Amino acid sequence: LARLLLEKGADINYHKPDMVFPYASTPVTEAARSNNFPMVRWLVEQGSNITLVDKYGDRPYSVAVQNKNQEMADYLKALEPEDWHNEQEKVRQLMPYKLPAKLVEYLKTGPLRLEFPERELVKWAELYSFMDVQEMTWKRKKLLSLMVQMDNYSDYLLLWSPRDKKLWYLDIEHEEFHPLAKWDDFIADPGRYLNGMIEGEFEK
């Protein structure tokens, strides 16, 4: 079907939001999201632009990282601009976000998987490594997305806001955006904050 659509002149990099894909993702990003490596490879060979990001900063490589598909991530990483995976360049790129040194150090050294089995709703979460942190814009605010995924809930983003130097969260489904905590407070007890987030404790 994809081959037929391209033969008929479809835009391989089409990424306007619609009812099916409201986040303005490209076909190759959606192929990565469904873990379809052969389709990703085929779309790339047909000229897909793997550097285009969707509304939440995702691109094929970051989706492969989220899906823990190392083979796909390695394939896409090799095709991306080299400086996207260069630590000095990443430091330069993220300077405007005024990240605390402790946060940067944590994302470089880990542990990136946070576990709190005694909690009820969310028992674990996984943060991005420093190199994989994603830039995104929400209602004209420039933010950094720090969390790959968390237990039971896929519609929440954990974000760093340079404006007040705090963690915020975004409930994608309900478009709720609220402040959560300073980094030091959050990392001292992430289970409390992530479960409180789900329970609506921080909605102000």
Regions from the language model: what does each represent?
Residues L1, P38-M39, E71-M72:
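Conserved ankyrin/ankyrin-like repeat signature
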Residues L1-V20, V91-R92, P96, L107:
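Eukaryotic tandem repeat interaction scaffolds
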Residues Q70-D74, W84-N86:
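Alpha-helical linker/edge segments of TPR/alpha-solenoid repeat scaffolds
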Residues H15-T29, V53-R59:
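Ankyrin-repeat boundary/"N-cap" motif
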Residues R3-I12, R41-N49, Y75-P81:
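Ankyrin repeat domain, specifically the short helix-to-loop turn at the C-terminus of the second helix
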Residues H85-K204:
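Helical anchoring/docking segments at protein termini
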